[in-house]
Amino acid sequence: MNDEASKQLTDARFKRLVGVQRTTFEEILAVLKTAYQLKHAKGGRKPKLSLEDLLMATLQYVREYRTYEQIAADFGIHESNLIRRSQWVEVTLVQSGVTISRTPLSSEDTVMIDATEVKINRPKKELANHSGKKKFHAMKAQAIVTSQGRIVSLDITVNYCHDMKLFKMSRRNIGQAGKILSDSGYQGLMKIYPQVQTPRKSSKLKPLTAEDKACNHALSKERSKIENIFAKVKTFKMFSTIYRNHRKRFGLRMNLIAGIINHELGF
């Protein structure tokens, strides 16, 4: 679907097919036009694909995760041309500020921390990426989200590791937040930040009481915001299916999508 065909769609259908709101698409397009004019101030050959169609093709790639060859055929250009120009779009948008903005936390903020996995093909050195628990190879992304839904930070590891180890490697300072909510993967976090709340664990000798179960249920309900954010990220099939590309661009792409989600939520 090119830009001309998308103009016939309703706003709701545009969002479902492209992955972003129409107003967001127009704002991103304005950023690209400014960057393109600066890059080609001295003129040059006119590209076969307009900026509107280039942005549409780039978003379709992340949203649908078809191959570049298939999308390039739809737009009537060569695969290598689309790859090169799509990568320019990704880098330009991130450098122009379409990413997660660094906003300091305050004592009034409640933040949630969690990690999600993205499957990858079996690598040559498979043990570094193997999840022994879930029996597949994966990369991990850790998000810190406020109770309003703003993504504060996003950290990526291309080698599979425990949630707490990823947090320590990220060196994120969230001590300014008034309350920190996490799942059982961050049991040691309360030794660093006393305001951390994690689920209460049971054992054979000490099963959970009714009060413990109620507290865990309330915590899970309060933490649902970060699960909703991960669901928004994974509407883009690049992050919900097996990631086929080079892993070095994975963090850039996920930060770009996280920045777009923040923007559409008003942050």
List the predicted regions and their residue ranges:
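Active-site-flanking structural segment that lines cofactor/substrate pockets
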Residues: 39-53
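Short, amphipathic alpha-helical "recognition" segments used to contact nucleic acids or chromatin
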Residues: 50-64
